[in-house]
């Protein structure tokens, strides 16, 4: 599992909210990974924004972060239900931050994080300029993604060369070692 992490100024949350297509499929309410209600907060949402990477910053360890991000299902009891039930994850996580050094130091690698620097100055059109146009553009993006998916001509894993490039890129976003 990989989690894109966008770096930019205004518009980060709006981008992911619009990318979710319907506002109710987006949530930015994840503050702690050990919250008793964390799994209920995931249900019904397609994109979960970890604003300013707060949830990962509040985590006790990198292992807690990796375990949380890697789960494919949750088992918990909803109030008034008799027994816990398995619920498959149907969401992706997107971390946003204005900091450059947001990736945790992980001796096993940070394969769960894909930093995507965004320079709003280079954008031809800013996502906040016109929400209707932005939604139309994102609808087109999803239509093209669906065409690629239906063609079967895609890979869900990075090639070794791409993994090597990503690892080098991630170094630019690593937290400095504490002295």
Task: Please provide the spans of the model-predicted regions.
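DNA transaction DNA-binding modules
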Residues: 156-179
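Conserved catalytic/switch belt of AAA+ P-loop NTPases
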Residues: 62-85
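Short glycine-/polar-rich loops that comprise or flank the Walker A/P-loop
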Residues: 44-46, 72, 89-92, 108-114
